[in-house]
């Protein structure tokens, strides 16, 4: 379904508003650098502080600018099931290939609640769903048995998972419970290599925002079983993976983008604030280590 280096795009702001022109340039740069799909309005895109109108415009611009060159997996997550469906229906009409749907956060639903939430979305929208499991942010974990139940019940609707649990055993668990062809994407850049070795097909990546060509080359080496080359690229990228989270995300990502894209500002929305001096130092050192500045 999906594979390769898939950036979870940052949303550029200028003077408090969505900077559409810079976002279009970011989309072009990503595609020209080898990114295989794009994810607007995810965690890194500050979806939680976008209005619905802004959220939909970011998705719309991404799809317009991609112009069919790569698929767009639109961020459709919400802790309000009805609002998630609103995002999905808009994204379907706009031309998205799938919707990335995070486990509802703050509400802390049970596994039965998660099944009801994702079942409602699957039954009321034609947009394929990529499950997004990130318990460090949502508290609630989409357990393996829940994933298997959902995919078995809706095989044509729930088509992939982005797993950011950090538990590599889940790749094998999903392969055993669902099948080897089920699309599994890493949500942890630092685990991209072992996740792929276990059976994953790529990553929805934060680091790919600022190092799209390196990340695309890294995944190509993995796919070609060029382990020595993959390790070499992993070594170059590894400090950057951690630097992207050296302060509250996506502040370090936006600072890094401002260093590699002249027109990209490091502006974030409250309650996130700009990256600290220590974080900026870590980002600069990681960018230099990767050969990006």
From Swiss-Prot:
Keywords: Amino-acid biosynthesis, Cytoplasm, Diaminopimelate biosynthesis, Lyase, Lysine biosynthesis, Schiff base. The keyword Heme does not apply. GO terms for molecular function: 4-hydroxy-tetrahydrodipicolinate synthase activity. GO terms for biological process: diaminopimelate biosynthetic process; lysine biosynthetic process via diaminopimelate. Its main location: cytoplasm. Its EC number is 4.3.3.7. The record marks 43, 106 as: Part of a proton relay during catalysis. SUPFAM superfamilies: Aldolase (SSF51569). Homotetramer; dimer of dimers. NCBIfam families: dapA (TIGR00674). This is 4-hydroxy-tetrahydrodipicolinate synthase. It comes from Erythrobacter litoralis (strain HTCC2594).
């Amino acid at each position: 379904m999906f594979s390769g280096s898939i950036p979870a795009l940052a949303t550029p702001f200028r003077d408090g508003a969505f900077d559409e022109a810079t976002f279009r340039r970011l989309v072009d740069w990503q595609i020209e650098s080898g990114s295989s799909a794009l994810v607007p309005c995810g965690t890194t895109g500050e979806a939680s502080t976008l209005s619905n109108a802004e959220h939909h415009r970011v998705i719309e611009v991404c799809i317009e600018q991609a112009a069919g060159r790569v698929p767009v997996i639109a961020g459709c997550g919400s802790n309000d099931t009805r609002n998630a469906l609103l995002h999905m229906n808009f994204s379907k009409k706009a031309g998205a290939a799938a919707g990335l749907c995070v486990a509802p956060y703050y509400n802390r639903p049970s596994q039965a609640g998660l099944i009801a939430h994702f079942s409602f979305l699957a039954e009321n929208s034609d947009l394929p769903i990529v499950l997004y499991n990130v318990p460090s942010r949502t508290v609630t974990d989409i357990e393996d048995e829940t994933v298997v139940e959902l995919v078995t019940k809706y095989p044509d609707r729930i088509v992939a998972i982005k797993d950011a649990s950090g538990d590599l055993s889940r790749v094998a668990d999903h392969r055993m419970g669902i099948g080897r062809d089920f699309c599994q994407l890493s949500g942890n850049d630092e685990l991209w290599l072992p996740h792929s070795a276990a059976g994953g097909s790529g990553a929805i990546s934060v680091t790919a925002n600022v190092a799209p060509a390196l990340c695309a080359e890294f995944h190509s080496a993995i796919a070609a079983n060029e382990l020595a080359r993959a390790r070499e690229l992993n070594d170059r990228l590894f400090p950057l993976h951690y630097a992207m989270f050296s302060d509250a995300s996506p502040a370090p990502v936006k600072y890094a983008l401002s260093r590699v894209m002249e027109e990209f500002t490091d502006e974030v929305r409250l309650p996130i604030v700009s990256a600290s001096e220590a974080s900026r130092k870590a980002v600069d050192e990681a960018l230099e280590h990767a050969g990006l500045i």
